[in-house]
Amino acid sequence: MRESFASLLATGAGKLALSLLFAATPFTSAYTFNQVPSPNLDISNLGRIAFAGDFDSISLYEYEGQTQETPSRNGTLLSRYPNGVFASINTTDADIKAMCNLRINDTERIVFAGNFTGVGNMPTPGGIALLNTTDGRVRALDGLDGTVNTLYCDKSGGQVYVGGLFNGLNSSNAIIWKDGWQELDFNGFNGAVHSIAQAAGGNIIFGGEFTGIGRGNASVASENATQIIPISSANISAQTNSGLPGFTDPKVIACKSDYSSGGAGQTWLLANNAPGFWKADFGFGFEPTRLKMYNTDFEGRGTKTFRFTALPDGGIMNMSYVDPSNGRTAYCDARCPLPQGNKTAQDFTFVNVVGMNSFRVDISEWYGSGAGLNGIQLFQDAMFSYAVNDFNEAQNCGASGTLSKASSTGNWQVSPSHNSNSQYLTTVLQGDPIRPDAASVTFSPDIKQSGNYSVTIYTPGCQGDGTCGSRGRVNVTATIGQGQSEEAILWQTNNFDKYDEVYNGYIDAAGGFQPSVILRPASGQGPGPLTVVAQRVRFTLLKATSGNINGLFEYKPGEKLDENNLADSVINAAGASLDPRGKALITSVSSSGQNLYVAGNFSNNDGRNNIFSFKQGASDPTALPNRGLNRQVMTLYQNDSMLYVGGNFTNTGEGNVQGLNGVAALVNDKWQPLGAGVNGVVLYLVPFSLNVTANQPEQVLAVSGFFDSVNEFNGNPSTNVQDFAVWVPSRSNWLHNLDFFTLAMSGRLMTFADVPGGERWFGGSVSSGSLLASGTAELNNGDDALSLEAFPVNLQAQQSGEAGVPSRKRAILEGQDMSTTGVRTGKFHTEGNNNMTILAGHFSTTGTDQQNITNLVIVDGGDSDKITGFSDELDANSTFTALAVTSNNILFAGGMVTGRLDNSRVAGLVTYDLTAKRFTPVQPPPLQGPNITVNAIAPRPNSNDVFVAGQFLTAGSLGCAAVCIWNTERNQWNSPGNSLSGVVSSLTWISDTQMYISGNLTSGDNVTTILSFNPSNNQFTAIPGAINLPGPVNALTIANEDGSQFWAAGQGSDGTAYLQRYNGEQQWMPVDSALFGPGTDIRGIQVIQVSENHESSDLISDNEDLLLMGQIQIPNFGTVSAALFNGTNLVPFLLATKGADGQTTDGSLSSIFVEFPAFFSQQNGKHLALWAIVLIGLAIALVLTFLLVVAGILLEWYRNKAKGYSPAPQSYPDRMGNVGRLPPEQLFGTLSVPRSRPTNYLFTCTALCIGMDVPTIHRRCNPVAHHKQLPAWTEQVRTEQTTETRPAINEDGCGTSIGGLLFRLPFSRARRISGDDVFDTILACSS
């Protein structure tokens, strides 16, 4: 049965962590992977460096052939790179179900098979091929028609036993390949074969769904098993005609209610005394088995000899017939006779069954004046129903009773046959989701008798009509009795023609019941377009059973088979005793040592429920402990003394072993759970190697099937997975529960084969990366080699409005709603002895204290990586896109943010106290406008101003579009000017007096993409030539030390990506656009130093590379998430993927964040360690301090000497004489008490006043109306109100207002005031 794994898994690729220590023990492989040159990046001057984006796994580009492109959603031939990542060697258009290795001509080969119709672009009819493990080349093993389920490589005999659902030579469902196809003695089985194994004694054991041996799906030789081929639907032509009215139309003999009748309008006559031909061209292919010719006797005319030519091959068919003169069987080919004057048909039987879509009857001899015919009928021993109803049996063409037919709903069009067998119907559907009832085709065959039938549906390949990109899944429902139906989900993504068996069993045709097959779109698909095709359905009447066989058969090679003694085999007898009788399903047979295990869906009163065993030499089968398992077993894997079992079971037959959910192990005749199993069905068990312990490779078990979680057990919580998990036997635990540096893998493994002395090969569909990391990863440079490391937090994707609900990720691309999932930005916060990593975007996770965290998470490396973050305070569908931390440890987080804090609305921006671990009491008033988004936050150096930019119109009630300033000291919004509007994508400070603003901007009347802003005078200056860039700037980074040069990237109006460098001299230098393929989206750029210089370029220094992030399409390579530009070429750097809706798709990077963003200020020369820099700075400070003290002492000594000062006497005759004048307690008692500060001393020297405005001095000096107590050296200037903000420094002195009066201290007076006054004033003003 052609059953795609994907048809069982409506959801698909899952994701799981796999241990990454492969590099310590490289694989030995005959298949060579070439390592690519190192990028030689020197990231030491950036400190810690990490990436943010929308991905589930990420890898460094290390080996040729390594790509970000996801494997076929159907099947892939897999090996592994030396770093352990799975490598796609070739792809198939459906599943690889079986593999084994065979040595052919002293070279190891892998035979692999399944339900595929092609490998790459090569057709593989029958679904089987041969792989050369040295060079990866594939050779199709032609000769089968159908699908293969299982293989067994007999290495001693140099041959392969093949089982499945197919025809080959004169066999069905089982055959041998040994340098070509060879039939088994018994010609196969009458049903599908699912498993083949060799028992300890050397006999071959077949398991499957069969009840007899022989060519089982050959049609039964019965009149009731034949079908008339509708010749009347063909395009009919002829050479020569008699010219007699009513006798010239060759079509009249193709469809008649009575073919023996003749005359005008019912007979076709050739020209007198001349040969000719009659030809029929069909829109479909067929394999005729019988021909009926009705000769004419009009006016003594008639056809004497003819030949039947099959087209397009042109072969003359060999036929047999009964000679009416003697009743004996005779044969003919080029000169087949028709009797003269015959009133009935002459029957001919084709000796060979040959496919054709056209034929020609060549008439060479005639009776009387010329040849002619009354009728012609063609039959086949197969019952088809075609979607194109013209190809079905026609009314009034000789057939009686129920006829085959088809009906349809929806908008279907007839498509040419292309490379297929026949024309077919096609419909293209739109919608999200696409409704299953949008279109359907119902096939109704001509079933004349009850019996066992094989029902197969044919699907034309997608390469012929070019629809491979839009094909999907269909639901096929076979109604095989009153109220009885069978459903199957089938993929139509096959490259070449295929057929799938949708039912095998009894059909009751009594009472006029007509079975049907309905094809419609499967549910859960969309958006469109979805292309659905419908071609034909076949009903094949099967032979009766042969022998006492029930899904299990033992074959003894080299011995002649005696069908009368089949029951002498213990294995055959054991199968025959299983229930249901004649319907037992054997899915897997496995041999190890002296034991043979048989598993499937069956039962028996002796305890053989769904699994049992044979011991070599035993006379009876052995039931396994606890009466087997309670439901179907799908797969077995034997590893030494341990048998692993996967299936749909939940317990033993006795129900007394808990935790056997879908997967279990049999050890020393005892059932053991794998944890507590999974919550679904396990279909495949595949071992592979991992270094779970450093440098100690061990076997782990990949578990694939249909499940979405691993069950809780022994304190290990239930974990969401997607159809894939890995069991680690040495730890008796699932890999995701173990704390390892991990590799990412999504998809499934279905089968494997080992090459002696080489690597293990796999079949499945796998996307893997060197690191499992959801949305963010850190880049390290240890031991002179780059590596990736995940942050110690497990981020889960969430969709809008579904906070905390894990779901598959969606791409975050320019122009899309940012409420989609992913990590958009991050921040390393290391100032003030902090060691925090802040990640922000749209996701959910769980904190250290088990609290729910959404969209912003904080990992505190200074507190054992404690995980905290934003909980439910803000709307869960918010998305953060920008972060910044100020010097007082306040986090600014912006994006598309909404919610309420302390019952106050916030929008676009929130502030969070990282010290107190709570939102600040005072939040910035909400930003306002349509689609409010903050894209950039940039605190001004050496200032209390935080610049916030993005898409908004006002901040609170203040009008400041696109860019606004939040002052952290006054807690208020300020506008940089009223002339700016548009959307800002980035802010970049060059110094505390210059900033670059990029995006899609308008300043005054100037439309541009990049502005320079000077906060000292609030002036915007357009960068020369920026208005001529192809489109808005999405990313900008500095290109030189003084910031006069920079890189800018974005997308033009036509969607084409651009990258240009501004050289600081009003000149733009574009990068060749041919380097970027269609669909490139550059979202971030960063200059990085290299340790080895590359070729010089006008665009970039030879010791630098430019890192591009986003989704980068490199021509002739594919998509990457990050690439390096060296001035000439793009080199792949990072490859990222993500899981989505059952598939794995390209991931993307949105930004880079580093510990030390000031790249150019640190890049020159060799870089010292931080501790060395601190010590050097301290030493310099001490030296300077010492020199200043010495200079001060010398200066004072010189001044005193110049004025004639001399040292005072140093004698102290009475040291205690003045103690009584001022007791010590009065002198020292006030030292611990704060010094009383007179509030009237409000002025200080010019240095204290410069830069102060009135509110600042008011706040610092606590002014009160005590001006009458002011020192005599102050001047009262005038009285005025002081509510306005005005400078406190003017050209001749400092001034402030106290009690409504403005006072001024002239500089001259300031220089003459006493030291005490100055001292008191400093204390007052600095408070």
UniProtKB/Swiss-Prot annotation:
GO CC, alphabetical: plasma membrane of growing cell tip
Protein location: Cell membrane
Segments crossing the lipid bilayer: 1170-1190
Chief location bin: membrane
InterPro entries per record: Gal_Oxase/kelch_b-propeller, Kelch-typ_b-propeller, Rax2-like_C, Rax2-like_second, Rax2-like_third
Signal peptide start-end: 1-30
Alphabetized Pfam families for the sequence: Rax2, Rax2_2, Rax2_3
Topological category with respect to the lipid bilayer: Single-pass type I membrane protein
Cytoplasmic face residues: 1191-1327
Induction (free text): Expression is not affected by switching from squalestatin non-producing conditions to producing conditions.
GO biological processes: cell division
Highest taxon, organism lineage: Eukaryota
Glycosylation sites: 74, 90, 105, 115, 132, 170, 217, 224, 235, 318, 342, 452, 475, 601, 639, 648, 691, 835, 852, 877, 931, 1000, 1006, 1126
Family: Belongs to the RAX2 family.
Job description of the protein: Has been identified within the cluster that mediates the biosynthesis of squalestatin, but as its expression does not follow that of the other cluster members and it is not conserved in close related clusters, L1 seems not to be involved in the biosynthesis of squalestatin. Probably plays a role as a cell polarity regulator.
Protein name: Polarized growth protein L1
